[in-house]
Amino acid sequence: MSIRERHLSHGAPSRIRTTVLAYLALTKPRVIELLLVTAIPAMLLADRGSVDPLLILNTLIGGMLAAAGANTLNCVADADIDKKMKRTARRPLARDTVPTRNALIFGLVLSVGSFFWLWGTSNLLSGLLAVATIAFYVFVYTLLLKRRTSQNVVWGGAAGCMPVMIGWSAVTGTIQWPALVMFAIIFFWTPPHTWALAMRYKDDYKAAGVPMLPAVATERQVTRQILIYTWLTVLTTLALALATGWLYASVAVLAGTWFLVMAHQLYNGVKRGEPVKPLRLFLQSNNYLAVVFAALAVDSVLALPTLLGS
């Protein structure tokens, strides 16, 4: 074997690995974590912890396919602005490591696959909800709202709320009020979570021409909005306590108090003209949501008596 042949044979695995990692990056695995954090507790609450583990697994697979497909299509649509932002400049399409056509096909295959997987392993409603989520995220949020309004994440964030609806419908075949409350929790949680991160990268959004609220409003205006939505989030988690036991209710109160304290600290710091660390609220908002939904899962598995007596 010549030196050139040996070099090519050794380089092939490296190229394959690079390609696989590039396609994986298109799916935004960290974003998919929200699916795992919220969908499983929703399914457990739907049947008070007695859900078939295989149904949970199949729903998660279908949900991950849907999220991966939506995220990939989002990368295709946002390739031009990703190149202008430091935070996203290393994404595969921004670096041209994956052809746009291939990424589009990849995203469509994942999206179609999610529908048929959920339809075949759960029910038609969960499959249709997955398709609706993908369509909303790509067409309404990415193509319509993101570049046109500072309230983009408020309405566009509805797509991130759908895993609880998909999970609930996979178990029950219907949509009931606890699923709508969980939807509302994530809906209200999304703006403070996203805007806290956007405060850190507001110059990126300005450079890309994306009117994210921190890029077009004062810090005081942004933190006031963050505070309002944080209060709405916490109050909505308390409403869900009607369908749960004392464990979830206790954690919702304690975690909610902690989340509110952090939001007030950010707002008051900006109000006093002090240096603030919005990224801290962003990171802790992840922990808050994880703790609340983990408590919901444990409460459901233990089948603790609910405040409504059912």
UniProtKB/Swiss-Prot annotation:
<dbReference type="GO" id="GO:0048034">
    <property type="term" value="P:heme O biosynthetic process"/>
</dbReference>
<dbReference type="GO" id="GO:0005886">
    <property type="term" value="C:plasma membrane"/>
</dbReference>
<dbReference type="InterPro" id="IPR044878">
    <property type="entry name" value="UbiA_sf"/>
</dbReference>
<feature type="transmembrane region" description="Helical">
    <location>
        <begin position="242"/>
        <end position="262"/>
    </location>
</feature>
<keyword id="KW-0812">Transmembrane</keyword>
<dbReference type="GO" id="GO:0008495">
    <property type="term" value="F:protoheme IX farnesyltransferase activity"/>
</dbReference>
<comment type="pathway">
    <text>Porphyrin-containing compound metabolism; heme O biosynthesis; heme O from protoheme: step 1/1.</text>
</comment>
<keyword id="KW-1003">Cell membrane</keyword>
<protein>
    <recommendedName>
        <fullName>Protoheme IX farnesyltransferase</fullName>
        <ecNumber>2.5.1.141</ecNumber>
    </recommendedName>
</protein>
<keyword id="KW-0808">Transferase</keyword>
<keyword id="KW-0472">Membrane</keyword>
<keyword id="KW-0350">Heme biosynthesis</keyword>
<feature type="transmembrane region" description="Helical">
    <location>
        <begin position="170"/>
        <end position="190"/>
    </location>
</feature>
<feature type="transmembrane region" description="Helical">
    <location>
        <begin position="102"/>
        <end position="122"/>
    </location>
</feature>
<feature type="transmembrane region" description="Helical">
    <location>
        <begin position="289"/>
        <end position="309"/>
    </location>
</feature>
<dbReference type="Pfam" id="PF01040">
    <property type="entry name" value="UbiA"/>
</dbReference>
<feature type="transmembrane region" description="Helical">
    <location>
        <begin position="124"/>
        <end position="144"/>
    </location>
</feature>
<comment type="similarity">
    <text>Belongs to the UbiA prenyltransferase family. Protoheme IX farnesyltransferase subfamily.</text>
</comment>
<keyword id="KW-1133">Transmembrane helix</keyword>
<comment type="function">
    <text>Converts heme B (protoheme IX) to heme O by substitution of the vinyl group on carbon 2 of heme B porphyrin ring with a hydroxyethyl farnesyl side group.</text>
</comment>
<dbReference type="InterPro" id="IPR006369">
    <property type="entry name" value="Protohaem_IX_farnesylTrfase"/>
</dbReference>
<feature type="transmembrane region" description="Helical">
    <location>
        <begin position="149"/>
        <end position="169"/>
    </location>
</feature>
<dbReference type="InterPro" id="IPR000537">
    <property type="entry name" value="UbiA_prenyltransferase"/>
</dbReference>
<feature type="transmembrane region" description="Helical">
    <location>
        <begin position="31"/>
        <end position="51"/>
    </location>
</feature>
<feature type="transmembrane region" description="Helical">
    <location>
        <begin position="53"/>
        <end position="73"/>
    </location>
</feature>
